Amino acid sequence: MKIIHYIPSLDRASGGTAAYMQLLAKELGKLVELHVVSHTSNNPMKMENCEVHNVASMCHPLEMNRQWTFLLHEIQPDVVHVNCCWIPACAFIQKWVQDLGYKVVLTPHGMLEPWIMKRHYWTRKLPALWFYQKAAVMRADVLHATAESEKENLLKLGYN
């Protein structure tokens, strides 16, 4: 099986999701052909048992799309796993991947929890929900919760 994981940053300063990806790759990479796609970082975490690919950022969306399309055609993954929310690049990548016929797993990593949804709701969350986030959650082939409480809160949203 071939899996591509996308994470916006593998930088040591980027927090829990990068640390999660480091631990996941170390073990999952023993079982499957694992590729991790991210963006260039000054201080990236060491990744084992996977191939790391850096693509252009959303500052260069056409180049990012071109690089993603190339990677997808080269790797031919069975699934693409997007690990993020609230970042437009995540929604664009998911759309591009699904438009090419690949299955997508979306893991919000707690970013759709009620307390986070309430934070900056009117200025950040609501516009993002309107423009891309709700559609991304609805279009995901699989929505992956990292805890039972997150699963319950995702089900309450009713998006997927």
Describe the predicted segments one by one.
Residues 12, 87-89, 152:
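Short glycine-rich, flexible loops that bind phosphorylated cofactors or substrates
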Residues 136-160:
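A short, active-site helix/loop in glycosyltransferases that binds the activated sugar's phosphate group
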Residues 6, 37, 55, 107-108, ...:
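Generic beta-sheet signal
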Residues 28-29, 98, 137:
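Anion (oxyanion) recognition and catalysis
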Residues 79-114:
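An aromatic- and histidine-rich active-site surface loop
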Residues 45-75, 79-88, 119-125:
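A short, charged, and often flexible helix/loop element on the N-terminal side
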Residues 1-43, 48-51, 75:
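N-terminal subdomain of nucleotide-sugar transferases
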Residues 112, 125-143:
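Membrane-proximal helix-turn-helix segments that form the acceptor-binding/catalytic region
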